[in-house]
Curated annotation (Swiss-Prot):
Any GO BP: translation
GO molecular function: structural constituent of ribosome
Name of the protein in question: Large ribosomal subunit protein eL21
Gene Ontology, cellular component aspect: ribonucleoprotein complex; ribosome
Family as reported in the entry's similarity comment: Belongs to the eukaryotic ribosomal protein eL21 family.
Gene of this entry: rpl21e
Cysteine pairings via disulfide bonds: none
Keywords: Ribonucleoprotein, Ribosomal protein
Species in which this protein is naturally found: Methanosarcina mazei (strain ATCC BAA-159 / DSM 3647 / Goe1 / Go1 / JCM 11833 / OCM 88)
Length: 97
């Protein structure tokens, strides 16, 4: 059998919650708002599948450059190139200075 090439491949531990984090996420994560230019961390919540960024961006930090619907558009550097990542607020954390 050949290996799969799906979007969630190689994510056995990346998309796994610890025992204390299990269950649904709080509503406050869904209604948090970010401003343009704000730096945010991508922290994927596996209990929310809609609006999930590609798992290869787990742990990346990016700048909010806009909003499309309820999702935010982030500018993320991957190597020498800048990528645009779309994500709902459940998968984002504000950066603390």
């Amino acid at each position: 059998m050949t290996n799969s090439h799906g979007e969630r491949r190689c994510t056995r531990y990346k998309l796994q919650k610890t025992v204390r984090e299990r269950g649904i996420s709080p509503v406050s994560k869904a209604i948090q708002e970010f401003e343009d230019g704000q730096m945010v961390h991508i922290d994927i919540d596996p209990s929310v599948q809609k609006g999930m960024p590609n798992p290869k961006f787990q742990g990346f930090t990016g700048k909010v450059i806009g909003q499309r619907g309820r999702s935010y558009i982030l500018a993320v550097r991957e190597g020498n190139s800048m990528k645009e990542v779309f994500s709902v607020p459940q998968h984002l954390k504000p950066q603390k200075y």
